[in-house]
């Protein structure tokens, strides 16, 4: 939303430095985030850089307050600030990666007319089998038990919703600008891989869980690059991610930054 992070920017010098760094790398980002029109901020190429700065600013503020994470994860775009927090990427490189990601995913959203719907109250295997009945519909976000978001061709999404309802589930169409985390985004993954190969990649200093697998990130540089790049065109297995993070940990010590 317009104005997100503005209070922190005004009150926290480190947050201000972070936003100012983003502004120096991509002029106009801070104005769109703090003062722009809502329609402008919802454009993928603007949303992603603004969310990156806001996510990381609040995570760092918690750390400065003595609340340091021993494990992190992010949903979709949120995985990139989590990578910066975990020391896998420098803040500057992570922001540059987000700019590439947002720009390319925005372009592909224009190229491919996509739609998305949440499939509710059905087992994952039922939703997956229903997706296979269509040429270009895929499960993309495994959010929680009984809730899987599916995306793909805008021409097929209504029929997919009808098929979900026929099988006893609920289907809710979602207002999105593109079919993210589908094969439509393969070109974005390729662009990200090229960019990552020119960046310094470090082993995680804080345990970080990958959207694509729901498991901790690998330590090997080539595998880290592959995991980050393919995330844009792969399903987000967030239910598995949370289950694995909570294994052996207390839920009351979990913080969610949106």
Model-found features: residue ranges?
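A short, well-structured juxtamembrane/interface segment
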Residues: 236-244
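Generic recognition of short, well-ordered alpha-helical segments
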Residues: 3-6, 187, 240
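Glycine-rich anion-binding loop/nest that anchors nucleotide
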Residues: 243-246, 251-258
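FabD-like malonyl-/acyl-CoA
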Residues: 1-129, 174, 254-257
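Alpha/beta catalytic cores of group-transfer enzymes, especially the acyltransferase/condensing modules
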Residues: 23-30, 36, 86-235
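Short phosphate-binding/catalytic loops that engage adenosine nucleotides
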Residues: 67, 169, 250
């Amino acid at each position: 939303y317009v104005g997100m992070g503005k209070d922190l920017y005004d009150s926290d010098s480190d947050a201000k430095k972070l936003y100012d760094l983003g502004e120096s790398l991509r002029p106009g980002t801070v104005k769109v985030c703090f003062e722009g029109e809502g329609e402008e901020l919802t454009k993928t190429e603007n949303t992603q850089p603004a969310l990156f700065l806001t996510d990381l600013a609040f995570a760092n503020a918690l750390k400065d307050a003595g609340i340091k994470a021993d494990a992190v994860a992010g949903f979709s775009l949120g995985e990139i600030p989590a990578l910066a927090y975990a020391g896998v990427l420098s803040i500057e490189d992570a922001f540059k990666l987000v700019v590439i990601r947002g720009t390319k995913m925005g372009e592909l959203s224009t190229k491919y007319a996509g739609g998305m719907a949440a499939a509710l109250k059905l087992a994952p295997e039922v939703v997956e089998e229903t997706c296979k009945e269509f040429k270009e519909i895929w499960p993309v976000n495994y959010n929680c038990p009984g809730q899987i978001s599916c995306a793909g061709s805008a021409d097929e999404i209504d029929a997919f919703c009808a098929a979900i309802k026929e099988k006893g589930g609920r289907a809710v169409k979602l207002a999105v600008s593109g079919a993210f985390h589908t094969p439509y985004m393969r070109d974005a993954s390729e662009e990200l891989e090229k960019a990552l190969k020119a960046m310094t990649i470090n082993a995680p200093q804080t345990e970080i869980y990958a959207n694509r697998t729901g498991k901790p990130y690998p330590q090997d540089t080539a595998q880290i690059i592959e995991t980050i790049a393919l995330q844009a065109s792969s399903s987000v297995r967030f239910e598995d991610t949370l289950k694995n993070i909570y294994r052996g940990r207390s839920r009351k010590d979990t913080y969610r930054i949106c």
